[in-house]
Amino acid sequence: MLNKSLHYLTFFSLCLAFLFSSGLHGQQTKGVNYREYDIESLQALMQAGDLSSRQLVEFYLERIEAIDRNGPQLNSIIEINPQAIEIAAALDAERQKSGSRGPMHGIPVILKANIDTADEMETTAGSLALKGHHPPVDAFVVRKLREAGAVILGKANLSEWANFRSTHSSSGWSSIGGQTKNPYDLARNPCGSSSGSAVAVAASLTSVAVGTETNGSVVCPSSVNGIVGIKPTLGLVSRSGIIPIAHSQDTAGPMGRTVKDAAILFAAMIGEDPADPLADIFPDSLPDFVGSLSKDALKGARIGVYRGHSGAGVDARVDRIVEDTIATLTSLGAEIVDPIEIDTEGMGKAQHEVLFYEFKTDLNAYLEKSGAAINSLAGLIEFNETHSDTVMPIFGQEDFLEAQTKGPLTDEKYLNALANAKRISQSGINNALKNNKLDALIAPTRGPAWLTDHINGDHSSGISSSSLAAISGYASITVPAGHVVGLPIGISFIGGEFSDARLIQLAYAFEQASKARKPPLID
């Protein structure tokens, strides 16, 4: 059954769509490779009648079959939407009859598998415990995308439970989806937890994708897979209908091959949702995230170099990319303030308590509301123990067990930890920006992708700059900046609350000058 956002298109309209997508126009695009095409280019072709959304969907489906299911078996897509071609055809008919809804009309999108859809696809967080789970309604962000005319192409594999099950997990592995591979080196890890979303974008299995982040889960996989990822200010993108970890940090975020593509998707995702507890801080007005992009955005900007991130100085090759980034920013007219030091002592410990407390409460609430067959964390723990051979063949559920010991969110220990985590992270960013009159901070997003290891779990270099933005709830964006032995390295632009538009502008200007992204050589 077609989604209501298609406005109950008539049978005649559907016939038009099929004629449009398989007739003369189909002959014009036969054999065309849409790998690496950006959204604006695709829209131009569709507006000219030289491409249909159905043809684009079919191109991606063929590519998924060729290199995700077969060949190198990237294993990034956990499920294909069986209605994708039908929806695309209906949107083609609508375009012919009444024009385009906007820049996302007919554009395929992959969703992380922890995002609810009320269709034939499951929402599982990659866990066999939720196999067969069909939520009753779309997540708010999915409703926004459907309204914008996006085609939900499928769901992406992820680190099971968004990497909140075990202390020894392998990022990109789930009991339903198996191990996702990095397209730049199949033996290396895609990071997580939005692993499949990042790989699908990097390998041109979709135009764009939606990931989710609690701490690093959008920006890390974006960095190591050579794409752009936006971690929004908390409250801009609704969390309703997304399997949670912690409401004080959780957000969905757009992922694309270019800053502009990510910005286009971002603009379509944003909206005030009364069901989200943060609805009261939603801005009265929003900037033009796409129209404000300029190659000159860095001219006169003051950029601080954050040197206190995790793993600072451990990899000289990453340090050289940071120095190259500084040189590019300077050449574009930015004023560099280096170094910027931020005292984060106690932040990580406080975050630890917050996440485990909130996970138990938030997950129990989600499971109960969404009608899942297993409706509590305690039930999940029992299921995993009973089915350990298939659910826990390579790592356990230490995080689940610790979370289950936590009390209610009225506990003084939780309240103190939450206050400390927010105070340290928010004041750290706020003071750095204010005292130095900065537009943004920069830091390497992550080190190069590590070898996937199912015996010892993840073991990266330790380089990471995601925590400040994640814990504070402030904005960040990662953009490709260079490579270490062919492996992508991203640079993060980090700002204050609701600095999203400014960060996107700065990242766009850097991207246009550096042109650092190189597609993976995989087919």
Predicted regions and their residues:
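Bacterial N-terminal signal peptides that target proteins for export
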Residues: 1-12
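Bacterial N-terminal signal peptides
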Residues: 10-20
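Structural helix-boundary/capping segments
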Residues: 66, 151, 202-304, 309-312, ...
